[in-house]
């Protein structure tokens, strides 16, 4: 594992310049200078990202490297959340990852929308872990999936006596010290992507916005709702497709950081136009195809990025 460093400003050079300035004025200034304050400034950026400095991580958000699919695991103190469960391949990657994290129970499981690249291994998750709450967005009957992966998930839920709680915008609840807001879907649309659950999770002063595969029509619904979208970290919608992450939407979210769950395939995602939009707002963009699994640690104020590659 390694930590990414921000490159906007050379804080080492700042320390050197202050030293030189102190010598020029008076050597005694070195003794009286507040070095603790300077060092603290040198390791923490304006957006709260900590560079190679340990923090008391009350919350860790894991964006799994699952190719052009989605799976996010969150642990916050003694609470555990799973958002989506990748595609069918590579087999068992989600369950095995959760087992390595010593997960026994999931307090919340979220299906952003029932496309195969989001629910591919959900049946295995349901079979292998105790689940307290399972939520999804209701979709119109005319676009309800009929393919095997979705039907298998429903059968597995039934076998384990688990019920789906269907949610829409406006629902707010807490799991431990995490505040969760469902921002979408608001209206029904004629494609599964724009019926995705859009969810904001806040821990202390740090917030994460998860958008599933929400496209521009759903983004506009959420903008028009007047909800506060501003978030520290954005999980970029639809793997960086040009139909998502509209400029209007990003201007409301104003993310300091973006994470794109994507793999190498002929779709050539993320699209350049989306990266250009994101660069207008983000200090850094992280991609699972470049960095592998990405883990964000936070104490509710500062954040630290850990990457697999």
Role assignments for model-derived ranges:
Residues 2-309:
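Non-globular, low-confidence helical/coil segments that flank catalytic cores
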């Amino acid at each position: 594992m390694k930590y990414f460093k921000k490159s906007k400003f050379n804080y080492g050079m700042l320390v050197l310049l202050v030293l030189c300035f102190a010598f020029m004025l008076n050597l005694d200034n070195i003794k009286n200078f507040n070095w603790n304050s300077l060092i603290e400034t040198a390791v923490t950026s304006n957006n709260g990202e900590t560079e190679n400095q340990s923090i008391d991580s009350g919350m860790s958000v894991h964006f799994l490297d699952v190719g052009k699919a989605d799976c996010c695991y969150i642990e916050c103190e003694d609470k555990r959340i799973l958002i989506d469960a990748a595609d069918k391949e590579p087999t068992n990657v989600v369950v095995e990852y959760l087992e390595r994290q010593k997960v026994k129970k999931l307090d919340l499981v979220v299906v952003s929308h029932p496309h195969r690249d989001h629910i591919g291994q959900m049946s295995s998750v349901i079979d292998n872990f105790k689940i307290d709450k399972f939520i999804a967005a209701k979709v119109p009957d005319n676009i309800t999936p009929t393919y095997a992966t979705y039907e298998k998930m429903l059968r597995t839920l039934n076998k384990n006596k688990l019920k789906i709680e269907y949610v829409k915008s406006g629902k707010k609840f807490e799991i431990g010290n995490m505040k969760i807001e469902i921002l979408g879907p608001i209206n029904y649309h004629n494609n599964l992507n724009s019926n995705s659950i859009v969810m904001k999770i806040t821990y202390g002063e740090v917030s994460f916005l998860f958008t599933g595969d929400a496209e521009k029509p759903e983004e506009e619904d959420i903008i028009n709702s007047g909800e506060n979208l501003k978030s520290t970290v954005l999980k970029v919608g639809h793997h960086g497709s040009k139909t998502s992450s509209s400029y209007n939407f990003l201007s409301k979210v104003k993310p300091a950081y973006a994470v794109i769950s994507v793999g190498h395939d002929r779709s050539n995602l993320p699209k350049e136009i989306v990266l250009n939009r994101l660069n207008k707002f983000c200090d850094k963009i992280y991609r699972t195809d470049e960095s592998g699994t990405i883990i964000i640690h936070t104490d509710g104020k500062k954040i630290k990025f850990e990457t697999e590659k």
